[in-house]
């Protein structure tokens, strides 16, 4: 989990993958249509202009083969290919995350940054990504949207790109220890396991 924090005036959109799909099927898929709707949204562009923000769209590594199919109408929207980006840098340098079910939302929440879930598929991809153990309605770290227009509305509702009280509590419940000693704790846990195995 990312422990550093260095935020730019940038939105990050990162969505999970659709397994085993062809390009011809992908362009017909709800996933493509929903992402396209958001990327081409005049309301989103207006929001970015008003807030002087940039928007980085970073498809899942398995979806990067389709990155050429996406386009934007504004120089404030960047379609990011994996070859010229490091995921950790995108997480650190973004102040808001828009995602469907991608587990990067845990990293974002750990840094106490706002998350907006754009779950346009009525939970279908949730099953495919094995997130059945996580209840987004009950445990999620941000609002759930079904349409691109709803995402933009939620962006406007954010206050100074901070989590509201409801989601702060959920983050604290999920991550009761928040410091810079995670690596040390993992190391000590591994050492204890090794010691137990040698007994």
Model-derived features with residue positions:
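Conserved catalytic-core segment of nucleotide-activated headgroup transferases in glycan assembly
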Residues: 1-70, 145, 182-184
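Donor nucleotide-activated moiety binding/catalytic core segment of transferases
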Residues: 31, 56, 61-106
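A generic local structural motif
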Residues: 41-43, 83-85, 103, 130-131
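CheY-like receiver
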Residues: 47, 90-93, 154, 189
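Catalytic binding pocket for nucleotide-activated donors in carbohydrate/polymer assembly enzymes
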Residues: 68-74, 103-174, 178
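C-terminal amphipathic helix plus adjacent low-complexity
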Residues: 15-27, 53, 146-199
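Surface-exposed, flexible loop/turn segments at secondary-structure boundaries
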Residues: 2-4, 63, 85, 123, ...
